[in-house]
């Protein structure tokens, strides 16, 4: 009887040891599976990313400016410049086009109007630099819910980047994010197809998403009621980012500023607009609740919260991960 009990005890011990070893091997397998992968969770905006980071739901967060700089007052630190990592990954030192200006086809046909609009957008770049300290007050007065610290303005990379200069990048985005292989040239504004039609009159509706894109039209907001563009008064509407595409889809925006690939994809699918220019290039930063710096290799096995699913942030981050031998978890 005693021998039988000893035998049973021995078997039980072996079973426990095997189970323990199996658990160890399983853990090793899981760690190996995570060695080259990064879990990416997408959020609607920078505020949601920051909330998830503060709650410990994610390890790192990717947000745009001005949220990255404004986050310092909430205990967040910038640990990675995605523009620098993108340049290393792709060899493209000029960054990636983000928010872009789309105009109705009828307006794009009038070179007088387009030239006047581009001139105002160029003047705006100087305006926001000279008035950086007042951007929060100005834009919040127009409906923005974002803060625009003066230090963030240069990092928002606001400019006027003509369609021809960003076309190749946008086409690649459309291929990667929207499965569009052949983007028609007709998506982009072509001044040779426009004619001088003189000044017009009336009020045009411009829609722009909250955040850095609104900086591109700060001068129009500041001088609304006095500044005209080729005879037109332009009324600026700052709206939530997740509603911006509807203003091209419905056609109620005469001018719409939205993510480069999103607007181009709508035009490729029949919307009567032209891609005029990009307004911001590369404004993405990775933030953390800890100070220091993080490399792409450090992200293996981590969870990263990111804005912009199916938009430029996803495109840029995946390009960086791929170049560093990492993949996103499905």
Task: Label every PLM stretch briefly.
Residues 2, 6, 23-34, 150-235:
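N-terminal hydrophobic or amphipathic helices and topogenic motifs
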Residues 72, 140, 178, 267, ...:
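Short polybasic/polar patches that bind polyanions
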Residues 6-18, 26:
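Sec-dependent N-terminal signal peptides
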Residues 144-148, 182-183, 271, 326:
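Helix N-cap/coil-helix junction residues
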Residues 30-45, 52-66, 75-85, 200-330:
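Short, glycine-/small- and polar/acidic-enriched structural segments
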Residues 42, 46, 61, 91-96, ...:
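Solvent-exposed, acidic/flexible segments
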